[in-house]
Each structure stands twice: as C-alpha cells, then as structure tokens.
Amino acid sequence: MSKRRDVQSVILATMVGLALLPVWGCANRQQAVALYVDAVELRELNNNDKAIDKLNQATKVDGRFSLAQSLLGEIYEQKQEYKKSAAAYGAATRLNPWSFRDYFSLGRVYQTMKEFTLAVKAYRRACELKPSNFEANLKTAQCLYEVNDYSQAIVYGKRAEKIDANAEELHQLLGNIYDSQKDYEQAVRSYKRALEMDSSNPGVMMSLAVAYLRTKRVEPAKELFTAVTQIQPANSSAYQYIGYCYLQLNDVNQAIDNYRQAIKINSYDWEAYRGLGVAYMTKANAENDAELKAQAVELWRQSLSVKPDQPRRDRLIKLIEKYSK
C-alpha cells in the first residue's frame, strides 16, 4: 500500500463519524477531509506552503472543520508566523471549545509572542478541560507571573506542584514569584528545592544567592556566587555580587579585586563601577587617601555614564558632589 493510502487510512479511520456529519452536507465534509489528508501528506514531505493551500481550501469548503484550522495553527507555528498561527488556533477553539490541545497550543503561541494576558486566558481554559495537566498549570503560572498577578500565579504553581513535585523549572518559578512578593524566606526554600534537582544550574544558584542576600545571609551568598564563577568564569554579575558580599564583610581589598574582575569581563557593568567606587571611597576614608577618593568619584561618574537612569541615581549624584569639593 502506498504512503498516501496509509495516511488516508489512518486519518479517515479516526474521522468516520466526523466526516459523515451533515453540517454542510456529507459531500462538503468528505471533500474537506480529502483536502485535509492531502495537507497531512504534504506536511510529511516538508511542503508546508502547499499544505497550507490545501487546508485553506478545506476551510472554504467546510467552515466548521476544526481539524483543518488546528493543523494550520501547527504549520504556521512551525514557520514562526505566530500571528497567523494564533488566528488559526483561535478559530479551532471556537469551532471545538472542548479541545484541550487547541487551547493549550493557542496559549503557547501567545506566550511565544509575549502576549501574556491572552496566553493566560487560553491556558486557563486548557486547565479547565484537563485540571491534572502539569504543563498547562505550569504555563498558566508562568504567564500570570509575567503580568504581575503573583497571587494567582502561586495558585496555579501549587496546583502544578501537586501534579509533579519534582520539576526543577516549577520550583525556580515559585522562587521567582515569592521573590517578587518579597517573601524571601519562601523564595529561599523554593530555590533550594530547585537546586536539589539540578545542583549545577548557575541560574538557580544566582537566584538563591540573591535571596540569601535579601535575608542578610551574606556568607552563604558569597559561596554560591563563587561557585557560579567556577561554572561560568565570564559571569560578570557573579563577580559584581561577590564584590558586594566582601564589602558587607568589611574585606575591602577582596571587594576591589572582584569588582575589577566584573568590569574586566563587562565594561558596561554599571553596578560594578558603582560598587568599586564605594570600595575605593571606603578605603580612601580609612587611609585618608585623596587619590583613591578621586578615583572613587570618577568610577561613580562612569557608572552614571553607562546607565544614567539607574536606581538611586540622585543619591549617587549627591555623593559625587559631596566628594568632588
């Protein structure tokens, strides 16, 4: 039997009932099914443009044929034509409002497009259709986090956790949500759980270390940032944070060394310039060194040059004015 006959047999066997529904008449539905079969075969041959033509014909012949819209959504998504993909998946959900697959796919495309509010709406419907689906709950939580709806993000995150408590990605997300809510102790617990599942993940290590800093645990934060530099020697942010930790621990020379390393890696690290300026000024005041004081002021100016709209900008300008006299 030919490949075409194989494709036809499989698809038609699963669509017998659908194909015979008298929506626009059996002839219309059967013609649409035949065009759909052609499109599936063309897609298998990587001829997506011709497959799209067949599917568009199928939707014109039978405007209620949801499977054609669903496959159009898949093909457009594969081609990274996301607006067209969303339109097709949206049409599929309107034609078949009980299709988990189409709502989930619609949410995924909106999430890719960073249309997070629309993604939430689609994913929530997917969760209604399959409440025990881990990915649907996880992605709903992700998108709610993106739109700053942290309380609802926690709700869906916890639902996902009940389904699969061993997903590192989920615990990292929960850590991010708790951090955004300023619940830093919960954030620490979530990041620790994520790190238990992937002990060498530098992203999780950085997040946990920052959470440690926010809970005044400087030493374990420094150790984690240092571990990150062993995995990612070019991670300027890790060195910048190590510099900050050493400042908090009153080790100015180590702070200076690490801030310098951060700037060596990334000459646009405004936080490292600012922190190095603080370290120099601290050392200058301790040693009554006018030259170090001048260098500190110049570093602060460089920080503002790199990022003029940085947080606490006014405070830094006042320091520059104070020590420039």
Region roles according to the model:
Residues 281-285, 290-325:
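Terminal, low-structured helical/coil segments at or just beyond the last alpha-helical repeat
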Residues 37, 71, 105, 139, ...:
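Canonical tetratricopeptide repeat
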Residues 13-22:
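Bacterial N-terminal signal peptides
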Residues 44-54, 79-91, 113-125, 147-159, ...:
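Structural signature of tandem alpha-helical TPR/SEL1-like repeats
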Residues 25-71, 78-80, 94, 325:
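N-terminal leader/linker segments that initiate helical-solenoid repeat arrays
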Residues 31-33, 66-67, 100-101, 134-135, ...:
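Helix-start (N-cap) detector for alpha-helical repeat units in TPR-like alpha-solenoids
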Residues 43, 70, 77, 104, ...:
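Position-specific recognition of the canonical hydrophobic site in helix A of tetratricopeptide repeat
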